[in-house]
């Protein structure tokens, strides 16, 4: 009996010691996790309702092909799905129908005729969103309160003045201190959102002339999305191990491949580029330009001369 009681005491002491040991270890692990720079999770945001694109702003042959004429508006996700499921092979490469019916630049067509379909440079399903976006065009005008307004990049001031003259928007003299402030009604906001796929930045239906000008500048800016980009120097391809194709005096690679290669050089904890990468690109990218992936992409490439084909 005594031996049994001693065993109980021994087991009790061992349990307390074991608990203390594990508690200390767990505390050490927690401290290490707290002090380590872990990438912060982005706060989940409420999903915004998807904008419907007016049928008249979608490529007419595409609308007819898929019987979308009677739609009140076409979701971009539907366009993406139709492009992916009808213009690509089972291997995920752009098929011959897609080459004829989707909007491609002349350079893109030349590259497709040069590289093999098995090449990573060939257009594939990773390019669906770019191809789908090209099927919609920017609005050139909108109607409001019986007036027709034209959207032209070099005549934005005239547009704003005309909106004021027609009383479609009103100058708010009380709020106009450093900048002219305008009252913009909900009905006009809805029209602009429908025709340009984005809303002006307003607060309590008030918007400054600067923000309104910037808004019209953005919605009238031509879409410059590219599948292929021109590298500034052939050495960039070697540094990033990129597949390339030469067209005349220019060396092209896929925009997505270049972006992925640069993104892989970002440290997941510090969210900064690796030091070795800084050294490799120092000749092409100034130190103050190394702010993010998209900026580095701009510094390593030459602006494309876009000549569209199959557009309407």
Swiss-Prot record:
Keywords of this entry: DNA-binding, Virion
Entry keyword annotation includes Cell cycle: no
Subcellular location, principal: virion
GO cellular-component term (any): virion component
Induction (UniProt): Expressed in the late phase of the viral replicative cycle.
Function text: DNA-binding protein which binds to the hairpin form of the viral telomeric sequence. Required for the production of mature virions (MV).
Protein name: Telomere-binding protein OPG077
Lineage: Viruses, Varidnaviria, Bamfordvirae, Nucleocytoviricota, Pokkesviricetes
């Amino acid at each position: 009996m005594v031996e049994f009681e001693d065993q109980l005491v021994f087991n009790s002491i061992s349990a307390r010691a074991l608990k203390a040991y594990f508690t200390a270890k767990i505390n050490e692990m927690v401290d290490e996790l707290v002090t380590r720079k872990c990438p912060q999770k982005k706060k989940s945001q409420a999903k915004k309702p998807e904008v419907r694109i007016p049928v008249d702003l979608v490529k007419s042959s595409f609308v007819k092909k898929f019987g979308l004429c009677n739609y009140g508006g076409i979701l971009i996700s539907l366009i993406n799905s139709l492009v992916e499921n009808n213009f690509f092979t089972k291997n995920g490469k752009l098929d011959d129908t897609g080459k004829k019916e989707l909007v491609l630049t002349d350079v893109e067509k030349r590259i497709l005729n040069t590289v093999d379909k098995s090449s990573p440079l060939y257009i594939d399903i990773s390019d669906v969103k770019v191809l789908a976006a090209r099927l919609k065009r920017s609005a050139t005008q909108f109607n409001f309160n019986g007036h027709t307004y034209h959207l032209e990049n070099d005549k934005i001031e005239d547009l704003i003045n005309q909106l004021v003259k027609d009383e479609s928007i009103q100058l708010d003299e009380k709020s106009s201190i450093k900048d002219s402030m305008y009252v913009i009604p909900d009905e006009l906001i809805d029209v602009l959102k429908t025709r340009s796929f984005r809303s002006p930045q307003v607060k309590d239906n008030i918007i400054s002339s600067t923000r309104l000008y910037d808004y019209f500048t953005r919605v009238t800016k031509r879409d410059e999305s590219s599948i292929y980009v021109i590298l500034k120097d052939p050495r960039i391809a070697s540094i990033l191990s990129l597949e390339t194709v030469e067209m005349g005096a220019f060396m092209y690679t896929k925009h997505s491949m270049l972006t992925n290669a640069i993104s892989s050089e970002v440290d997941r904890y510090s969210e900064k580029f690796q030091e070795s990468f800084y050294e490799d690109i120092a000749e092409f990218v100034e130190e103050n330009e190394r702010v993010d992936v998209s900026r580095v992409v701009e510094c390593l490439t030459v602006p494309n001369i876009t000549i569209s084909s199959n557009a309407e």
